[in-house]
C-alpha cells in the first residue's frame, strides 16, 4: 500500500472518530434521544420587534411625492340601494335553493362561499369607488387634468401595416364562413331536390300501379266504368298542351344560347331568301308597301269626276 493510500485511510478513521465523539457529546447534553441519530434543534422563538421593523421600513422607503405614488388609505364607499336590494335577493335565492332541495347540504349564509364571493366583490367595488371619490379632487387641486379633450388624438400602439394584416385575416375568415354557408345551402337544396324527385317517382309508380289494378278489376268485372281512364286522358292532354305552349314560347322568345345579334341581317335575309319575310318583298317595291301600283294624279282626278 502506498503512502498516499495510507494517509487517506487514516484521515477516514479520524473523521469517523470525530463524528462518534460529536454524537456522544450531543447525547450527554440531551440533544439526542433513544431512536434519534440526528441532533434536533427546537423551534426558534418568533421576535416581533416593531421598532426595528419600522426603522427598516423607513430605511427602504422611497421619499417620493404623492403624485408619483398615488397611494390611498380610505374607508368603504356607502352601498348603493339597488346593490343592497340585489344582495338581499341573492341571499334569499340561495336560502330557497337549500330549503327546497334535500339533496344539498345546508350551508349557513355567513359560510356560503357563493355569497362570500359576491360580498367580497362588492367590497372591492366600494373600496375602488371611495378611492376615486377622494383622489379626483386631490388631482384637481394639484392642477392635473383627469379628462381627455374632445379633439385628443391617441397614437395606436400597433402600426397600420399590422392592422391591415389583421383586417385581411378577418376578411378572409368572413369570406370563408360565407363560402361554407353557401356550400351548406347548396347541399341542402340538392338533398331537397333528390327527395322531391324520389317522392315524385314513388307517386307516379303508385298511380301507375293503381291504374293497372283498376284495369284488372274492370277486366274481371268488378268495375263497371272506366272513369279513371278519363282522368288519365285529361292529365295527358293537359301535359301535351303545356308542351305545345312551351314550344311556342321557345320559338318566340328563344331558349338558351346566344341572344345578342339575332336581329341583324344576314346574306340570305338581305337577298330575300328568308321564308315569310321575303314573301312580301319584290323587286322595286318597298317592304310593307302594297303590291298594286297606285294610279297617277290625272287618272285619279278623272275617277273623282265620274263619281
UniProtKB/Swiss-Prot annotation:
Protein name: Probable rRNA-processing protein EBP2 homolog
Region annotation (Disordered) ranges: 1-22, 189-208, 236-307
Key words of the record: Coiled coil, Nucleus, Ribosome biogenesis
Pfam families found in the cross-reference section: Ebp2
Ranges in coiled-coil conformation: 205-252
GO cellular component, one term: nucleolus
Taxonomy, superkingdom: Eukaryota
Keyword Kinase: no
Family, per entry: Belongs to the EBP2 family.
Gene Ontology process terms (BP): ribosomal large subunit biogenesis; rRNA processing
UniProt biased composition (Basic residues): 246-266, 294-307
Localization per Swiss-Prot or TrEMBL: Nucleus, Nucleolus
Biased amino acid composition, Basic and acidic residues: 236-245
Its biological purpose: Required for the processing of the 27S pre-rRNA.
Species of provenance: Drosophila melanogaster
InterPro entries associated with the record: Ebp2 (IPR008610)
Alphabetized GO MF terms: RNA binding
Amino acid at each position: 500500500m502506498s503512502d498516499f493510500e495510507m494517509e487517506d485511510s487514516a484521515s477516514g478513521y479520524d473523521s469517523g472518530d470525530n463524528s462518534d465523539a460529536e454524537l456522544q457529546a450531543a447525547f450527554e447534553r440531551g440533544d439526542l434521544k433513544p431512536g434519534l441519530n440526528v441532533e434536533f434543534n427546537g423551534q426558534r422563538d418568533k421576535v416581533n420587534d416593531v421598532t426595528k421593523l419600522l426603522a427598516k421600513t423607513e430605511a427602504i422607503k422611497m421619499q417620493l411625492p404623492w403624485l408619483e405614488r398615488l397611494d390611498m388609505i380610505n374607508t368603504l364607499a356607502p352601498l348603493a340601494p339597488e346593490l343592497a336590494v340585489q344582495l338581499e335577493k341573492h341571499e334569499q335565492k340561495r336560502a330557497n335553493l337549500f330549503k327546497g332541495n334535500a339533496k344539498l347540504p345546508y350551508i349557513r349564509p355567513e359560510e356560503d362561499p357563493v355569497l362570500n364571493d359576491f360580498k367580497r366583490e362588492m367590497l372591492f367595488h366600494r373600496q375602488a369607488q371611495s378611492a376615486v371619490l377622494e383622489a379626483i379632487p386631490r388631482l384637481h387641486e394639484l392642477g392635473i387634468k383627469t379628462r381627455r379633450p374632445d379633439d385628443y388624438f391617441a397614437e395606436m400602439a400597433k402600426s397600420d401595416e399590422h392592422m391591415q394584416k389583421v383586417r385581411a385575416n378577418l376578411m378572409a375568415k368572413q369570406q370563408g364562413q360565407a363560402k361554407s354557408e353557401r356550400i351548406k345551402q347548396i347541399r341542402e337544396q340538392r338533398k331537397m331536390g333528390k327527395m322531391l324527385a324520389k317522392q315524385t317517382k314513388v307517386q307516379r309508380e303508385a298511380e301507375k300501379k293503381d291504374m293497372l289494378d283498376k284495369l284488372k278489376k274492370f277486366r274481371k268485372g268488378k268495375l263497371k266504368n272506366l272513369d279513371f281512364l278519363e282522368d288519365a286522358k285529361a292529365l295527358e292532354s293537359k301535359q301535351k298542351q303545356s308542351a305545345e305552349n312551351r314550344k311556342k314560347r321557345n320559338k318566340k322568345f328563344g331558349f338558351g344560347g346566344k341572344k345578342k345579334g339575332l336581329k341583324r341581317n344576314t346574306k340570305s335575309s338581305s337577298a330575300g331568301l328568308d321564308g315569310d319575310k321575303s314573301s312580301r318583298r319584290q323587286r322595286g317595291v318597298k317592304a310593307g308597301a302594297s303590291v298594286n301600283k297606285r294610279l297617277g294624279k290625272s287618272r285619279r282626278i278623272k275617277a273623282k269626276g265620274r263619281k
